[in-house]
Amino acid sequence: MSDSVLVAEYPAGDRVIGRLTLNAEKTLNALTREMVDVITDRLEAWANEDRVVAVVIDGAGDKAFCAGGDVQALRNSSVEAPGGPCDYAEHFFAREYRMNYLLHTYAKPLICWGHGVVMGGGLGILAGCRHRVVSERTRIGMPEITIALFPDVGGSWFLNRMPGQIGRFLALTSSHINATDALYCGLGTHFFAHEQKQSVLEALAGLAWESNVEADTVKVDALLKGITADVDLPEAQLAPHIDVINEWMAGSNLLAIFDRV
């Protein structure tokens, strides 16, 4: 098995918690097709194992959870297939989108530790998990528009569920937001200092797991809500400007929106 995703199971009483750690620090844990396949395969396997009560997804290192798809690998594959079809890119996106759907529909508790850079495909993973931890250095964005792509990986679902016109604003400007903003617009559910990760994982392992999805989900929610963050939230960037954002993003005429921005 590839070491680009570290697969582990750690004890939680007489059960286990699965853990998937994106392990490509040099590329800020950017997703490759191989990584997507490992994540999907493990999630599907754990879904059918009663002893696995939850899954934690995090990233190696202190800089990033995941900077998105490995654009360099996608570019290289297209150069190698001038004029197309580009099998690598087609397979990558097809598999990535299936992985996103699997995350959104996963029955067991999914806890994502979204520290540092969380961009594009990384945000797709975070948004698909039920329990979405953000930290003091979380930096979230959907930068696809800057490379002539569109906000994918479930963006049409989670962007449209944000307050006001924030989803459209993030999609059209590729602006970055912090943990406070993530909590405000629903991309984050819990805030902790990054250095608390190990203690949070240990607390999860200490829960009285029942192998009952509904009961276990309630317990995870209660546990995470009961832990106090060791750092203060960063200053809000979205909420203070929601009226302006709504005004700029109003209507269906994109040219008019761009003129206002």
Describe each PLM feature range.
Residues 59-98, 148:
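Glycine- (often His-adjacent) and acidic-residue-rich active-site loop
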Residues 1-58, 101:
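Conserved CoA-thioester-binding segment of acyl-CoA-metabolizing enzymes
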Residues 57, 70, 125-126, 181-182:
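Hydrophobic/aromatic residues within transmembrane alpha-helices
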Residues 42, 95-106:
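Catalytic-core regions built around general acid/base machinery
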Residues 154-214:
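Contiguous mid-protein beta-loop-alpha structural module that forms a pocket-lining wall or clamp
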Residues 103-147, 169-170, 174-175, 179:
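Glycine-rich beta-to-alpha active-site loop
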Residues 129-151, 186-201:
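Gly/Pro- and small hydrophobic-enriched strand-loop and loop-to-helix capping segments
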Residues 193-261:
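Amphipathic alpha-helical blocks and their helix-capping loop/short-beta junctions
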